[in-house]
Structure formats: C-alpha cells, structure tokens
C-alpha cells in the first residue's frame, strides 16, 4: 500500500456554507504546522486561521486532528473546515499541496486506506458510496446497516462455518482408517445442509438488497393489443409509448426509469408476442424474450375482454412454460373499465392477479404498491443490508460449490473432493468482504467512489 499523504475536498464541489478539506497520511502533521502554525489537540475542534506560505490568512475555520490509528482511515488525519466557496477551497488545497510529499487523492482513496488498515471491510467501504448515492429512505437505511457491519456479520458467520466444516473433513482425510466413519456418520452432512440453508437465506436478503440499491427490472409482456404500452405510460406518468388500436404497434423494446417513493424501477415495454412472418416484428419479439429472460419480474398483461381466466397456465400455457423457472410473474388483467371486474387483488395458484384499466388509471396505484412491496419497500421498519451484483455473483458461486460438495458427499463419500468444494466456497465468500480479493477488483471498486471519500 502507498504511504503517500493525500488531500481532497470532502464536501461536494460548488458553493456552500461550509467546505471541508481532508488530509490523510503521516505528513498531515506537517500540513498542520505549515497551514495552522501548530498541531491541534487530537479530537478537539480548534478555531484558527488558515494561512498561505507568506503568513497571509486564506480563510478562518475549524481544524480537527485525528491521530492514527484512531481515525477513519487509520492514518493521521487533518480536516480543515472553512467557508464553502469553491475559490477559497481551491486556494486551500493549493496551499496544502505546497507541503512536500502531499498529492491529490484518487477517487475512493480515503476509504481504500481505511480498508487496507482494517478499519472496515470491503462491504462496509462499498456501503459508504451506497449511502451517499441512496435515492430513498429504504436504501439509506439498508446502506447504513451494511456500513455498521450487518452484511459482513452474515458473511463472516458463513465463512467460519465453512472453514470449520472443511477442517473437520480434512481431519477425516488425515485418518484414512476412520474416514468412512467420519463421512458417513451424518455429522458432516448435517453441518453441510445447515450451511446451505443459511446461505440460501443470505442470498434472498442480498437479492432484496440489490433491488433496493440498483432497482428492479420489470418487463411488461403479453399478446399484441393487450395494453402493454398503455400500462408503461400509466406507470411512467407520461406518454412514452405510442398507443393505437392496431395490434403490433410496438415493435421494439421501450424503457422507462422511474422512482416509486424513491425506489428505482426499470420498466420495459416489449413487442406483442405471437407467431408472425413479419421480419421486423420477429426481431422485436426476439428482443422481448431477451428482456424477459433477464428480468426480475414479469407483468403478464392480459386483455380482460378476451378471456375470463385468471390462472396464467389457463390463459397462455406456452408462454408461462417458456419463462425461467425462478422468474416471478404478476398477472395484470387489463381493460377493467370495459369488463366491470372487481379491482381487488387476488391470489390464483401462487400468482398475484391485478385488475386494472391502463387507459383510465383504475387499479394502477394498487399495482404500484405491489411493485414497491416486491422491491422491499417498508415505510416504518429498519432496512436490511444493501448488496451489489458482485455480492450476488459471489454468493451464487459459493452456493454452486456447496451443492457440488453435497453431491460428492452423498453419492461418492469423496472427502477430498468435498474439502476442495468447501475451499472454493470459502474463497468466494471471503471475496465479498475482501479477505481474499484481487488488486484489480479493489481498484475497480474504489475508483467508482467520489473523490474525498
């Protein structure tokens, strides 16, 4: 790790009441002596002049000194809190850079120092950026939970359990005369099953946390002229899609990004699905299926005037059977203004069914509440933890190795192969918190932070 002392503006660029300059590294004390003329008492606010090399006052404000390792970064840290004019702050940074051995910080470098000095792990460091970027109260609460170590705690528990089981299995291998007894007595299998179950719970929570952070991708799909584009317009609150009585008007994918109580929702309107010889329409239908296969949720749009059925398997079995097995489906019976249906939501064989009129807006608000619920919106509860795509991928990899290990144990009683799968699962989980993480990944993560964090 670099031993450079770094400086950056910690507050947002532009005009403001207060502006903060942060310095971290062993030269922070030199900066204090050069700019303030003295070293402030650690952890005490010191009102003083900020001076240039000639002794002229640049600004007046509060200086805060934190002696390492008792600081956010683990290094010596000096914060200069002055007036928020950008010119004044630029002059102050220029003055700090005149001290030998100081350079401008790279994006996220303060958080990277904290990570390298074991002041926080990788998920906590990422949570800082997520807290800053939060677009809803729920996202902010979840990011704060991660910053306080809730996600890390879950991952560390899994790593410890996997490590303990791996050591137990390797002990069985080291005593070959007793290996079969060790592997077949049920203790290892029971421990493995418990780990798999716990990982499944963490995966579900992480998936929810990822949706809160990144938004949920919802694809509106169905036959031509079912009202898909009208629903897109109703959810977006504007005329995003052309709506006509002509079936097949939408031939390409249309996207809208909206927020429901601050929670991001990515809505995809697709071409009507049907057999066609029209080349352009065929391309649109192929793209529709590509979007469906990568969706978090499908709104199955049904023209209520064409069928009374509510079970999607009765409405269009070929469509339902082609969907990915783990893809959630909400049935939306449209044109309730014409059918006179009761707008109450019902559950039909595990599917939520909503009756709406995309044209008049009837039932659309209830559908929005449903989507908010799917995204984990809770108006009065503490948030869960926040999660990123890389976390989900690492959890999936760990789950895959545990399943392979389960097969090796149940079918072959292969201790060596089980131990190897446990080792791979351990590595995947440890990458989440940064116990075993490549420098390339660290660089990618911290470079996405804002400067000054």
From Swiss-Prot:
> Which GO terms of the molecular function aspect are on file?
GTP binding; GTPase activity; metal ion binding
Q: Which CDD domains match?
A: trmE, TrmE_N
* Record: residues binding K(+): 225, 244, 246, 249
**What PANTHER family does the record tag this protein with?**
TRNA MODIFICATION GTPASE GTPBP3, TRNA MODIFICATION GTPASE GTPBP3, MITOCHONDRIAL
* UniProt-recorded name of the protein: tRNA modification GTPase MnmE
Task: Provide the cofactor list for this protein.
Answer: K(+)
The UniProt note on the cofactor reads as follows: Binds 1 potassium ion per subunit.
InterPro entries under this entry?
A: G_TrmE (IPR031168), GTP-bd (IPR006073), GTP-bd_TrmE_N (IPR018948), GTPase_MnmE (IPR004520), MnmE_dom2 (IPR027368), MnmE_helical (IPR025867), P-loop_NTPase (IPR027417), Small_GTP-bd (IPR005225)
Q: Name one GO cellular component term.
A: cytosol
Task: Please describe what this protein does.
Answer: Exhibits a very high intrinsic GTPase hydrolysis rate. Involved in the addition of a carboxymethylaminomethyl (cmnm) group at the wobble position (U34) of certain tRNAs, forming tRNA-cmnm(5)s(2)U34.
Pfam families listed in its UniProt record: MMR_HSR1 (PF01926), MnmE_helical (PF12631), TrmE_N (PF10396)
């Amino acid at each position: 790790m670099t031993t450079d002392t770094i400086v950056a503006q910690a507050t947002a660029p532009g005009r403001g009441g207060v502006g903060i300059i942060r310095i971290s590294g062993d030269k922070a004390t030199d900066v204090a002596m050069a700019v303030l003329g003295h070293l402030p008492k650690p952890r005490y606010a010191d009102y003083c002049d900020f001076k240039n090399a000639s002794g002229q006052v640049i600004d007046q404000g509060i200086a805060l000194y934190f002696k390492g390792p008792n600081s956010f970064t683990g290094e010596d840290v000096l914060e200069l809190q002055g007036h928020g004019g950008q010119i004044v702050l630029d002059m102050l940074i220029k003055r700090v850079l005149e001290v030998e051995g100081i350079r401008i910080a790279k994006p996220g470098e303060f958080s990277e120092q904290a990570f390298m000095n074991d002041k926080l792990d990788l998920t906590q460091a990422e949570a800082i950026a997520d807290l800053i970027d939060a677009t809803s109260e729920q996202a902010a609460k979840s990011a704060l939970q991660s910053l306080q170590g809730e996600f890390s705690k879950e991952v560390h528990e899994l790593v410890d359990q996997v490590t303990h089981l791996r050591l137990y299995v390797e002990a069985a291998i080291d005593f070959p005369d007793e290996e079969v007894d060790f592997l077949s007595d049920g203790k290892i299998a029971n421990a493995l099953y418990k780990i798999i179950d716990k990982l499944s719970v963490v995966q579900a929570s992480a998936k929810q946390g990822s949706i809160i952070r990144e938004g949920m991708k919802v694809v509106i799909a169905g036959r031509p002229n079912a009202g898909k584009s009208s629903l897109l317009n109703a959810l977006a609150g504007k005329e995003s899609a052309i709506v006509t009585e002509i079936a097949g008007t939408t031939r390409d994918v249309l996207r809208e990004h909206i927020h429901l109580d601050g929670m991001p929702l990515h809505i995809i309107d697709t071409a009507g699905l049907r057999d066609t010889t029209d080349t352009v329409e065929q391309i649109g239908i192929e793209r529709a299926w590509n979007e469906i296969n990568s969706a978090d949720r499908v709104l199955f749009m049904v023209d209520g005037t064409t069928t009374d059925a509510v079970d999607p398997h009765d409405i269009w079995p070929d469509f339902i059977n082609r969907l990915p097995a783990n893809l959630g489906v909400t049935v939306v019976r449209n044109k309730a203004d014409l059918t006179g249906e009761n707008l109450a939501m019902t559950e039909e064989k595990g599917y939520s069914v909503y009756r709406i009129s995309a044209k008049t807006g009837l039932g659309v608000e209830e559908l929005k509440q449903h989507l908010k619920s799917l995204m984990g919106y809770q108006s009065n509860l503490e948030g869960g933890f926040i999660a990123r795509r890389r976390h989900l991928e690492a959890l999936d990899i760990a789950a895959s190795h545990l399943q392979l290990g389960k097969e090796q144990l149940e079918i072959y009683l292969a201790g060596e192969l089980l131990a190897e799968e446990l080792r791979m699962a351990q590595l995947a989980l440890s990458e989440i918190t940064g116990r075993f993480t490549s420098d390339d990944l660290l660089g990618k993560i911290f470079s996405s932070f804002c400067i000054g964090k």
